[in-house]
Amino acid sequence: VPDHSAPRAGSALAAPAFAHLPLGAVRPAGWLRDQLGIQSEGLTGHLGEVWPDCGPRSAWRGGDGEAWERGPYYLDGLVPLAHLLKDARLLRTAEPFIEWILASGRPDGFFGPAANDDWWPRMVVAKVLTQHAEATGDPRVAPFLLRYFRHQLDALPRRPLRAWGQARAADNVLSVYWLYERTGEPFLLDLAELLPRQGIDWPALWRDFPYRAPQTRWDHRVHVVNTAMALKFPAVRCRLSHQVEAERANMAAGIAAIWESHGQAHGMFAGDEWLAGTAPTRGVETCAVVESLFSLAILLGTFGDAALGDRIERIAYNALPACQSPDQWLHQYDQQANQVRCTPVQRPGWSNGEWANTFGLEPHFGCCTANLHQGWPKFVSHLWGRAQDGGLAALAYGPCSVRTDVRGTPVAIEEETDYPFRDEVRIVVRPDTPGVRFPLHLRVPEWAAGEGRCTVAGEAPIPLAAAGWHVIERDWRPGDTVTLHLPAAPERIRRPSGGVAVRRGPLVFAYGVAEEWRRLRGEDPVADYEVLPAGPWNYGLVQGAGFEVRTAPVPRQPFASGAAPLRLATRGRRVPGWTLDGASTAPPPVPPVVTAEPVEEIELVPYGSARIRVTEMPEVEG
């Protein structure tokens, strides 16, 4: 399959800092391979069997059923998962959708179910088709999309973007750019300029952000998933305008406005449908988690800011696993940082319904049931990128392998690591031709700056003094190994609630409470469950107490309760006065907190491994 990640000669688009490698160039290994395997065995691999909207009746495979976004959403995760795993069963599941879509094109270029003419779901389908083409080389995709985009350019002045499509126009442009880089068709640039003009001007909104408080009224501009998808807007616009620094400033303004006003300890921003503030009991929608990861990957690839990789890892290794059951059959519509009862009870302030915090097949709107599947596969496929100098870049760390051409030579890379549960990353470079010279760009996380070190082919260690990029350019020989040591010390983060959260490297830690899962309705494996605490949750951290790092072997599912391969032991005390506010925790008591309860040793576990947890805790006197 041709690799179009290198810049096309004569392209009118600004080159990204790190171009996306085609689907399949990066594949999961180690515990990440296990994670995707669990996903294939869980809901993603069987959704059409248990949920008609993504089964044979879906209008996106010629049926008489759902004709809007659910089929496209599902494919946006199913297709990359199938190709990353080379899973024949998953590929067979996707095939009827792909074949029907490609056969549905009308003479004017429009396509899809006749019952629905919304631009928005076709934006998702275009992303699906570009991934399918990258992985398979299907020659039908480019002509199909050319016909569709010609139709879109002709029709948009008469039938402009509206509602969801207006909020999410940037995703449409991504596929337009993909096609332009392969065909050079000038009209695609006209379409890429028109789409953002018809969309919401998100950067203008962020520069004077009016939505800093928790929102109580519906508007597309406060919708949490729209916000997550909008993050990529500056990246999309700057490639055509070449105003890279202006759009970088817009990106920074957006990140500051959103996370300062609504950021949570686990790395995401809150929105239990609408932007919801910083309180640890406000919800975070699963769709927003997976869409934020994809948007941040686009931002990192476009602008090259290493801190975006830190942000990606924080979300992927905390909020992403937390939103599903360990077997990846069930999910929550909304998760909470302080989550001690996942019950069908209306939470104060939430616009989402009473079931949104439970685990099930469709605990609230079905968008998350359809859309959650892209989270892990797209994270894996964006772990590496191609730098402007022709080298390769490690954008986020995790066990994987890479196979691509570098300066005309096939090169394989094996990234051997149990990161983020361990601090060491080994990168083994295997060029087909010994002695090929190219740069390797290695991201230095903020938490490792000054303490990290890098060893190349057994030479003397090099200190990683500053966060950003450490570049190694050399003549690579098969088996040359780069070893990164990225040590991280546990740290307490003061939160707006008055409580503290604990982080170590990319992992956020929580006090994980023993869990009692109760089936409420339906049949396994897609029954609806509430989850209750099987022990006390109201602990505070002793002020000034240190942390002992404890490790265990990394199991197949490191995000299962009781299976955490990395834990922090510290001292804590019960706080009897810290109780519930309805079904959620009350705000952490304001320090200084005095309690007569004895000091105990408590263990904190990675956030993603605890479905009943307290992440923001009060500090108590020792």
Region locations from a protein language model:
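Extended ligand-binding groove/face enriched in aromatic
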Residues: W60-D64, P72, L81-F209
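Well-ordered alpha-helical scaffold segments within catalytic/enzyme domains
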Residues: G24-V26, G30-L32, Y73-A88, V124-D138, ...
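Solvent-exposed loop and edge beta-strand segments that line ligand/cofactor-binding
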Residues: P2-H4, A17, C54-G71, F110-V125, ...
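C-terminal beta-rich recognition modules with glycine/proline-rich loops and embedded aromatic residues
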Residues: M251, D310-N318, C323-R422, V428-P431, ...
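Low-complexity, Ser/Thr/Pro/Gly-enriched N-terminal "stalk/linker" regions
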Residues: P2-R70, A88-F110, P139
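Catalytic-core region of carbohydrate-active enzymes that cleave or remodel glycosidic bonds
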Residues: V236-S261, P280-Q328, Q339-V340
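Beta-strand-rich binding/interaction modules
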Residues: G435-V456
